[in-house]
Amino acid sequence: MKESVYHKLEILVERYEEVQALLSDPSVIRDQNRFRALSKEYSDLEEVVKTFLSYQQAQQDVISAEEMLKDSDPDIREMAQEEYKEAKAQILTIEDEIQVLMLPKDPKDNNNVYLEVRAGTGGDEAAIFAGDLFRMYSRYAETKKWKVDVVTTNEGEHGGYKEIIANISGEGVFGQLKFESGVHRVQRVPETESQGRVHTSACTVAVMAEVPEAEAIEINSADLKVDTFRASGAGGQHVNKTDSAIRITHIPTGVVVECQDQRSQHKNRAKAMSVLAARLQQAEDEKRDAAEASERRNLVGSGDRSERIRTYNYPQGRITDHRINLTLYRLNEVVAGDLSCIVEPLMQEHQADLLAAMGDE
């Protein structure tokens, strides 16, 4: 292990012990905001510190084994040789673990998200596929015990959605869904196809981190055009009697957000503003990421909405993620919500990208 990394880890251990002491300080316990912040810091430090302590223990085991190798008793030397090998192997394993734990964290990984699924090329079939994708993400969210709240929908004429936006909240949502942004392509025989021909359709998925109010970028009210209109679709008679739906246009960027799924105009406006903040933040992030990508191109994680990232081939039961050349014949399981077999390899590839970048520095 590099001396500089070892020194950083020693500093983290000191801070961990300091935070541990602060958490039992009565004045800190009384200050709930500070107590919460320190509890989070303690939790964030815990894994890397405990792993480093295991590393130090393995180092001590190597030293002890080396001492025992000098013993005159051949049985003790044989046992020491075994312990030496085990401790050395453990050091290498723990070094790899520490390397991953020391990777820069995306501060947004624990944020909730706005998931936006839009039908692209393919007409009715694209809208039906958008419905399938939304159902896939909803079921995956269920397995993760995340909460899904629909913000707005524009239903397709023959099922599915021309567009659907939902808020997904829970632990680590953005970190696990951020690689879903891009173009998802489907190849299958539509139900309306009498000749049995395979059609290709596409949908665009955007995953935007929800911006906490305290961190939201400032939106000037003078830059907004707000329209109210009567909500359509589900919600009973009530929604059609009042102009409760909201459309907000951000004039400088041309970004338009509609929300009509809440009962009151006030709630629809609040939701629409939250989606707008997420979209504007996403645009800022994309601009920054594009500048960084010109220096170093990541295979995964560009989040480019125009990038074709995945193909769902129904006749062959095949799903392919083009960014990491991953092909699985588990299409039915994936669209039923078992996304982990794709999410985990994408996260591992992203980690490998970050490790490679650290090696270049």
From Swiss-Prot:
Signal peptide: none annotated. InterPro entries: PCRF (IPR005139), Pep_chain_release_fac_I (IPR000352), Pep_chain_release_fac_I_sf (IPR045853), Prokaryotic/Mito_RF (IPR050057), RF-1 (IPR004373). It comes from Pseudoalteromonas translucida (strain TAC 125). The keyword Hydrolase does not apply. It holds the Pfam family PCRF. It is found in: Cytoplasm. Methylated by PrmC. Methylation increases the termination efficiency of RF1. PROSITE patterns: RF_PROK_I. The gene is prfA. SUPFAM superfamilies: Release factor. Residues 286-305 are annotated as: Disordered. This is Peptide chain release factor 1. Belongs to the prokaryotic/mitochondrial release factor family. GO terms for molecular function: translation release factor activity, codon specific. Peptide chain release factor 1 directs the termination of translation in response to the peptide chain termination codons UAG and UAA. Keywords: Cytoplasm, Methylation, Protein biosynthesis.
